[in-house]
Every structure is written in C-alpha cells, then in structure tokens.
C-alpha cells in the first residue's frame, strides 16, 4: 500500500495545476487565506474524486437512483483510501432528529429501558408486578386462605353502551354472574344497561372457598379468567369487600392499572407505540398566537384588525361578523380593544348559537338563513388541507410553537415515563447534559439487581464509550434531547466526528472542515486528542484549519496561497510545522510574530448610552442582567454551551427585531429591557451564502449591477437601439442568450455518466445575445465587466461615484480578487460574510445601528481576521455598535467591552462572570477566557 496520496494537475476552481504529495495515516492540516483554494483542494478535489470512485463501484442500475458525480478537474490522484467528509453544514432539518438519535445513544438507551427498567404505578407510585399463572395461584392461596372469593375478568372498562349482545353471549357460554358498576348481579335474559352512561363490567368466572385442596379448581378458573380478561384478572373478597388485581402483564397490585411489557419501540418518539399522541412525538404543539392574529388592537374589524381576514370587503364573512356584533355589542368600526372578553372570544373561536344572516346580497336565492360562525381560528385551520407551501406559510405566520401540554416536551406517551432505571425515566435521562449523563451512568449499576446488571452490562458499555467520545470533542454541555436543528455547524461536525471515532474504522481518509468552530480555547486540546485517536487507529486525517494549536499538533501542513482568488491556488509551503515557520508565507509571518494583530493603545469611550436586559432566563441563563454599552465593539465570550447564543441570538436579537420591525420572532424569557430607543436599525451579518442560485454574485448582491446596467442604458449604442437597463440583465428575456438562458453553459445529460457542462454554442459562454454584446462602455461590453475583478472594476469606474463607492467597499474588506460575476455558491462562508459587510459599509447610516455577528472568524485566516477587524472598527468609529459572539483571542483582545458567560457549559453555565475591558476579564480568576487573555500579557 502506498504511503502517500499523490495529486497531479489539480485545476478545480482557482487551483493552478497543483501537484502535491500528502502522507497517509497522518494528521494533515491545510491552511491559507479565505478563498485561497483550501476547500477546493480538500473537498472539491480529494473528497470529490474519492466519492466518484465509490459511485463507480455501483451498478448502472443503482447509479440511476443515487445519481452520479462530476469528475473533478485533476489529471490523476493515487493512494486514495475510502473518503469520509465531515463538514460544517447542518443538513438535518428533521424535527425528530436529536443528539441522541444522531449519535445512536438513543437506540442503546431504549434497549436499556426495555430490558432493565422497573415500572411504577402512575396512580399509587408503587412498583408494578409481573406474575406467571403459578405465582398468581400461590399468592391467592397464601393471601386469601380460608376466605370466600370471586375470580373475575374485566370485560368492559369505563365505556358507554347497553351491552345486550355481550350479556347474551356470556349467558350462552354458561356464565351466571357479572359485577356491573361495582355490584354483583345475575345475568338475565334480555338484560341491558343505560346506553348513555359509562359502565365497568367484570365477569364472575368462579366463586370458591380458598384452600390448598382447591388448587386444581383455582388454576382452571384462573386460566379462564386470564383468557376472558386478556391477561388480567381480579380477586374479590366477599368478607372484606376488597379486591386485588393480577396480570400476566405489568400491573399495579392495588389499582389494577396494567401496562404491556416494554419493548424498545415503547421508548421511541418516532414510533406510534411510544410517541405522545398529542404532538406525535415532536415535543411541541402549534397554538394560535393572539398577538399575530390581532397585531394592533386599536384598529377596527373594518380597518383590518384581524390580520387573517384583512380589511373590510362586502362578503358573507363580514356580514356574519356584523350579525355577531349585534349579539355581543360591537360594530365593525369599534376598535378591537373595546370588545368584551366574550365578544373577542366569539370572533376568534366561534359561537355556539347560529346567526341569522340576510343572503340577498350574496346569493340569487337570497332570503334569511341560519349560519354558524366558526371563528377566525377555524378559518385559519382550514388551510391544513392546503398542502401547498404558500398555504402552509400563510397559516404558520399566525402560529407559535410551545412545549406540548400533554407530554411536557418529553415526546413520549405517559406510560413510557413510568419505567425507571435507577430512579430516572428515559425523558429525565435525555434531558441531562452529556457530562451529567456520564456521571449518572457511571453509578447506575450500583442500583441494579444482579439480574438487571447482567442484562445491562454490554448496553452500558456501548453508551459510556459514545459519551466519552462526545465529551472528548467538547460537547459535554449538550443533552441527548437537544434538537439537531438547533445545533451550530461546528457542533454538528463534532457530533459526526465523535460518531466516526466510535465506528472504529481503519484505513479511511477523513476530511474535516474547521472542527474547532464554536470551540473555546480551553477545549481545543481535547479535540486535537480525538483527531490523533482517529489517526492512531490507522486512518488518514486531513483538516482544513487556521487554529495555531491544531497546526502545532499536525504531522504535515499544506499552506495554500499566496493570496485569495486568482492570486491564490498554489502550494506556497508544505511540510512540518518547523518547515512552515521557515517559509515566507503569510501564515508563517503570523506564526512567527513577524505580523500580528496589535492590541489597541486605547479603547473607545462609547456614547454613554446602553441597552440593558434584566432577568434573562432562557435555556441555561440564570436570570442574568446584561448591559450592552453603545458605540463600542462588544465581544460576548465563554466556553461552548455557556449561554452566549441564548443571550444574544435568542434574547437580545428577537427583542430588537420586535421593537424595530414588528417581527414575529419570540425572545426567550426575560423581565425587562431598556435603552432600545437609542438605536434605529438592527443588522445581523452571518456567513450564509449571498444567494441560493449560481446567478447571484457580488455585483447583484451589492446592487452595483443595477447601477452598471443603468450606465450601459445611457451609452450612445443603447440609446440608438432603444435598449433599457433590463436588456443588460442575464436573468430576464430580452438581452440574455435564450439558448443557455443567461447561464453561459449548457447541460448535457449523460444518463449513467455525470452531466457534462459545455460552453454555450450560441453565445460562446458570454451569457448575452450578439446585439447586447455590441453595446460598449469605454470599449468593454457587459460580459467583459462581469469578468473583471473588483480591483480592475474600481479603476475602470473611478469616475462613476455611485458604482465606485460600492466597489471600493468590497475592495476594502479584502475581496478585490473576486470577479463581479463570480457565482455566489462558489464563495466561502468568510467571503459571503464580508460581501454583506461591504454592502453595509457602502450605505449611509445614522450612527445608531446595532450589528450582530455570530463567530465571524469562522473559516478566516489570521490575515482575513485583520481585514475583518478593520471593517468592524470602521463601523464602530461611525458611532455604531458591533456585538460579536467569538472564541478567537485575536478578536477578543481588541474589543472595547467583553461580556464573559460561564463558568462551564450547560447547567453549570448561564452566569455573567465578568463584564468590562479585556484587562478586567483577564483579572477574573473564574473566567477561562480571562486565563487565556492573561497568558497573552493583558
């Protein structure tokens, strides 16, 4: 087997015919500036070729279902093992997916509860029992010796009906007595009960005096009772009037409540056997939100106070409301706030009494008719039958999702929660953090019987191993019940990493995309140990990463550069960490200290105003009061899971969105907020793509393309031909090439081979038709402009202020190497974020804007971080406020104000440890962030 992976002539995206040799069974880090070609090399070349080779092993029949993969633009790759990519993307949007299901710990947990749990009565709380027929006979002989008893089988439990047919059937079988609603009565011919009342009927199978001599008769009658009662029976003591229940199933001996024997599906919220019937195992229910249905109570019905109904129209709906108003003393012109509680409830939820409505205006038959007003809620609810996205979206805007009122968010049936292991049910265990769960599972065997211990031994071993892997990658603060949809990209990636470590595969090539995302410096060492564990098992590990600790731990480093875009795509250095230090790359400059991000000499005083949130207690926050001083660069820090996102993204952001834009986003619980009046705009800048289609590009997103098209409209050529600005858009008919619809390429389907993209034969890849391309400005047509880099375009349009200003903003954020027409889907997360920031830079602001960024350094090299900080500082220097959630110490150390949350993740976090300057935080002994800042000399 080869000891290296050899790549020859890689030309994917901006790679410049790269030849590279990477050692196998080593930890390899690929680093370089954002946009330099790291992901192109790791994912779009190595991983893509590995996947393509796997697909080629499938039959042509199978390939038509799973699709085929495009061959990457590379001459040859040798020494390639089976490839597994662990990316940042949170692809799982399934509401049923949780940390427990993804890691498969839930499967083992369900097995543990099915085989080694104890059931407890939901009525009395006593342990439920499980007997064989012989054991039941012994219990009856021992407990009722010498007494006269009746053996009874329950046949009807709390149901309405006359049951004449049942009594006739029992009489034909020779049964004489039954206990009906607590009274033993003789079964007579034609016997029937009140059909509208609820009844409980127990069949008297036998009456006997208990003695050892009567054991045979007792066994015969007991078996018949079990047959008639479907595994359940009762013994009635004539002397005391008391009864006791027995079952072949689990049963409460005092009340007779019985459960079926548990199976793994009993504890699965994805199975009808275990899922809560009210929420179908989702743990939450949709309820109508009055604030969304009636957003402004000062408006009248005629003015459109009820959002789903809209403004007054002369139709049957408003005619019914008018008649309803006569009954509840309101008119269509009264503000909703003046309605009585009964009147508002009638409007929203309907009225039981029919309304008399004159239909002459709405129907040719006319006349007065009785109509039932069903209410606005029913009107909205009818769209449940509308499967269209539009119908569902319309309905969902009036709903809010709350914890299920029946299962309390556990997702399971009540019966499943009566089974306990070491005193906890499966929902309670799933709600523990992984660290707490690991502590509980370490001692659980001590509370088990010998039999339970033998059954659970192997199951517990598997669970413990998986928990250890999750803790090793820094996810001890998560719970198994945590929805996968709520995980960040970094958390999802580390969960998949833990799962892969647990799979114990060997000779696999793993490719990871910045696994340190969202991880505090404190947890970095454990993550590196996990990657080393993968490597030491005989696997090759390639990591796209910028973290210095990760580089120091690597066996081999590949530095891609020297710059980004067209100025990147080459291997500027490769080898050990020491080899990289000796190179003259930008990465080496930062690692050696030749370049650094300097700590500012002084901090901004701010405006003196602040936003204060009091009593924030969402998720794990402990009723904290957080102050955000305005006019400053604020960094919210803390270990993973401490509560940073809860405070900023789930509390502060929705509060501001509701106040400024009447957003429907609901903040997590808090007591009060003050200072919102000091800001007039909220901007959230994330790393999501600037568009979902390849047609979106830097020119369209920054809106500079509109100005460029208007400029082309004003050229003499366009004026003569009568071309308007729309003629120069490749998204609409008119100026674009209709053969390729403005894409520049045509797709040729190859059935069992990957689709082939060829340059459009009509336009030659220029996107536009010949007439449009004949229009020129300064000798360049519209396609030439789209193929310019931003740097070239800044010079080309220097005399057009509206265009130059927007392009200069893109250049200032370090993206001058991008072409104006570069598809948005090919941009990295860091590039997308900086495009968005450039759009903000080019706008005029009032100096009262609040910017929120969540981990903006994701995917950024040291040099990219310097450029990002330059942009953020410009925004703050204008008087605006920037709040970032961040772990990167280069960002933290230059902030004006820090809010450090902790001390740990999960339940052990949620407190504001210290707030102040980086120097203040460095002096806090409880703060992990402070510890690392202190090591930097603060």
Regions found by a protein language model. Give the residues of each.
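Conserved phosphate-binding elements of NTP-dependent enzyme cores
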Residues: 1-938
């Amino acid at each position: 087997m080869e000891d290296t992976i050899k790549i020859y002539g890689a030309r994917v995206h901006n790679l410049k015919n790269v030849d590279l040799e990477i050692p196998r069974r080593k930890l390899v880090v690929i680093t370089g500036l954002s946009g330099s070609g790291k992901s192109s090399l790791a994912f779009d070349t190595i991983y893509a070729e590995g996947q393509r080779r796997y697909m080629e092993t499938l039959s042509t029949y199978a390939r038509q279902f799973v699709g085929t993969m495009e061959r990457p633009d590379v001459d040859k790759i040798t020494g390639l093992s089976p490839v597994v990519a662990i990316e940042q993307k949170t692809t799982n949007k399934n509401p049923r997916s949780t940390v427990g299901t993804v890691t498969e710990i839930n499967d083992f947990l369900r097995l543990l509860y099915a085989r080694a749990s104890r059931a407890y009565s939901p009525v009395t709380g006593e342990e439920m029992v499980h007997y064989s027929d012989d054991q039941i006979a012994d219990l009856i002989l021992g407990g009722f010796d010498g007494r006269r008893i009746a053996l009874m089988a329950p046949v009807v439990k709390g149901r309405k009906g006359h049951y004449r047919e049942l009594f006739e059937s029992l009489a034909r079988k020779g049964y004489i007595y039954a206990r009906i609603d607590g009274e033993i009565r003789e079964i007579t011919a034609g016997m029937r009960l009140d059909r509208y009342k609820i009844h409980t009927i127990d069949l008297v199978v036998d009456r006997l005096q208990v003695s050892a001599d009567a054991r045979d008769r007792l066994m015969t009658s007991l078996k018949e009772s079990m047959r008639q009662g479907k595994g359940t029976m009762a013994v009635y003591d004539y002397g005391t009037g008391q009864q006791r229940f027995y079952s072949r199933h689990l049963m409460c001996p005092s009340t007779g409540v019985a459960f079926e024997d548990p199976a793994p599906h009993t504890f699965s919220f994805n199975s009808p056997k275990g899922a809560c019937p009210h929420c179908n195992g989702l743990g939450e229910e949709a309820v109508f939100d009055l604030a969304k249905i009636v957003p402004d109570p000062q408006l009248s019905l005629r003015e459109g106070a009820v959002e789903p109904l809209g403004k007054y129209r002369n139709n049957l709906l408003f005619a019914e409301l008018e008649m309803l108003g006569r009954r509840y003393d309101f008119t269509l012109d009264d503000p909703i706030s003046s309605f009585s509680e009964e009147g508002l409830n009638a409007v929203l939820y309907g009225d039981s009494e029919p309304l008399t409505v004159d239909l002459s205006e709405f129907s040719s038959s006319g006349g007065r008719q009785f109509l039932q007003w069903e209410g606005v809620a029913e009107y909205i609810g009818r769209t449940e039958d509308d499967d269209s996205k539009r119908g569902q979206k319309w309905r969902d805007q009036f709903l809010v999702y709350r914890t299920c009122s029946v299962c309390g968010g556990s997702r399971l049936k009540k019966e499943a929660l009566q089974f306990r292991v070491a005193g906890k049910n499966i929902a309670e265990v799933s709600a523990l953090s992984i660290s707490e769960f690991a502590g509980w599972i370490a001692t659980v065997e001590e509370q088990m019987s010998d039999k339970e211990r033998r059954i659970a031994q192997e199951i517990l071993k598997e669970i413990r191993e998986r928990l250890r892997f999750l803790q090793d990658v820094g996810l001890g603060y998560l719970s198994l019940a945590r929805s996968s949809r709520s995980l960040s990209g970094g958390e999802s990636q580390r969960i998949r990493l833990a799962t892969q470590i647990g799979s114990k595969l060997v000779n696999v090539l793993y490719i990871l995309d910045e696994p340190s995302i969202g991880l505090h410096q404190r947890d970095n060492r454990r993550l590196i140990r996990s990657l080393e564990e993968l490597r030491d098992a005989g696997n090759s590990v390639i990591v796209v990463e910028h973290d210095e600790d990760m580089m120091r731990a690597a066996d081999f480093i590949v530095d891609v550069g020297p710059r980004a875009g067209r100025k990147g795509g080459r291997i500027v250095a490769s080898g050990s960490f020491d080899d990289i230090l000796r190179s003259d790359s930008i990465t080496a400059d930062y690692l050696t200290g030749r370049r650094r991000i300097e700590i500012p000499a002084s901090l901004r005083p701010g405006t003196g105003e602040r936003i204060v949130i009091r009593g924030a207690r969402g998720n794990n926050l402990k009723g904290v009061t957080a102050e955000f001083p305005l006019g400053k660069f604020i960094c919210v820090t803390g270990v993973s899971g401490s509560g940073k996102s809860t405070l900023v993204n789930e509390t502060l952001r929705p509060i501001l969105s509701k106040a400024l834009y009447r957003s429907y986003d609901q903040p997590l619980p808090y007591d009060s907020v003050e200072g919102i009046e000091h800001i007039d705009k909220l901007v959230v800048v994330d790393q999501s793509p600037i568009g979902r289609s390849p047609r979106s590009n830097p020119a369209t997103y920054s809106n500079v393309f509109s100005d460029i098209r208007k400029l082309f409209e004003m050229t003499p050529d366009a004026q003569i031909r009568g071309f308007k600005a729309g003629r120069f858009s490749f998204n609409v008919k008119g100026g674009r090439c209709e053969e390729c619809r403005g894409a520049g390429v045509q797709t040729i389907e190859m059935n069992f081979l990957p689709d082939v993209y060829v340059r459009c034969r009509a336009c030659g890849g220029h996107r536009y038709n010949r007439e449009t391309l004949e229009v020129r400005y300064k000798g360049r047509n519209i396609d030439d402009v789209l193929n310019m880099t931003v740097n070239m375009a800044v010079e080309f349009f220097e005399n057009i202020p509206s265009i130059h200003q927007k392009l200069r903003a893109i250049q200032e954020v370090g993206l001058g190497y991008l072409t104006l027409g570069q598809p948005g889907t090919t941009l990295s997360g860091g590039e997308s974020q900086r495009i968005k920031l450039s759009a903000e830079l080019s706008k005029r602001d009032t100096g009262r804007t609040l910017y929120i960024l969540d981990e903006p350094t994701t995917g950024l090299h040291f040099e990219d971080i310097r450029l990002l900080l330059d942009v953020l500082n410009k925004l703050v220097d204008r008087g605006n406020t920037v709040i970032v959630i961040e772990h990167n110490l280069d960002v933290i150390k230059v902030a004006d104000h820090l809010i450090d949350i902790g001390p740990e993740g999960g339940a052990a976090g949620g407190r504001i440890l210290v707030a102040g300057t980086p120097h203040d935080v460095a002096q806090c002994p409880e703060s992990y962030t402070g510890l690392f800042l202190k090591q930097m000399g603060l």
